[in-house]
Amino acid sequence: LDSITIVSPRYPPYVGGVETHVSQLAKRATKFFRKVSVITTDPLGHLPAVQEVDDYLTIFRIRSLAPRENYHFPSPSGLFKAMRQSHPQVLHLHCIHDVPGPIAGIMRGNSSMIFTPHYVGRLNSGLGRILFGAYRPFISELVEHVPRIICISRFEARLMINTFPGSAGRVEIIPNGIASDLREKNQWREPEEPTILFAGRLERYKNVDKVMRAVAKLREKNDKLRLRIVGRGPIKGELEQLSHTLGLVGSVDWYDRLPQSELFPLYASSTAVVLASEYENWGNTVAEAIGVGVPTIVANTSSLAEFVEEGLAVPVEPPIDDLKLAAKIGEVIDDPKKFSPKGMRSPLIISWDEAAEKTFAPCMSLVNS
């Protein structure tokens, strides 16, 4: 095939789940397309407007407004110019909750389309609810015209079909991949001192405060227990203050957003990874942690329940509170090897090569149709 353009609100060097997803697929798209382009935003204007990467990828970065880094409003003229320059045969749009992908869908011309919505079914800010409510009719029209809608979990697929009934029959499920090289280099071994890891955006719904309270409770009997928190977000300052209140100063290691090359060694050297959020359309950190074999504790709801169903993760039943978390974390740190998923196989744990094959191999029939 000749060309594909992937449109995403953000792209590395920014760090996050969508950024990882898009960059991993873009690297592998050259196996299927002669020309690969990414259109993304650069709110601060500090990065090159056009960047060639190793002769296989062109990145177009458009100035945008980005209130609280949650929503990205690109320059319409900049987006139109990048679309015209990339001239895609296939247009792969990302993020139903943000602006660039759906707007690029308006400008699609004769391009065949793929849509990966990263849909969570709810929004955590007033601006998000207003924005999504305003352009939902347009999104519905876009969804009606996209021949392939790729969701990353059964949970997300159900949300899409319930919200946009017209998408039924065109939704397929392709889980996010795992970096095979990092997985192989960072296989889990039980650490000498018990260490709990959370990695993700620091939002209230992630229940990191409850994880901290659970760790504080467990430290009453085991003062060697430590907590690692990786990420940034609007409640980081609040969580740092909570660490003082709970007497956890010196027992919590704080990390900013980390590249995967630095995150995987943290997985491999932790006693357990915890994601206590009750609402996730996928769990990148969960899949990665399971891939390296670390015991992984999750809220038994939303997409995270799929890992429990596969026997890969340790469940905490909702509603989540610190007492339930403390009980489950305590059970795991008493005998971590008993709960390790090391060596287990599942269709939820795939490589990025497999994810790219499933995503791009059908594009020939898409273009021909």
Where are these regions (language model features)?
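An aromatic- and histidine-rich active-site surface loop
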Residues: 46, 76, 90-122
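Nucleotide-sugar donor phosphate/pyrophosphate-binding loop at the beta->alpha transition
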Residues: 112, 122-142, 180
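Carbohydrate-associated surface elements
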Residues: 155, 177
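Nucleotide-activated donor-binding/catalytic signature segment of Leloir-type glycosyltransferases, i.e.
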Residues: 240-258
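Short alpha-helical donor nucleotide-sugar binding micro-motif in glycosyltransferases
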Residues: 257-258, 265-270
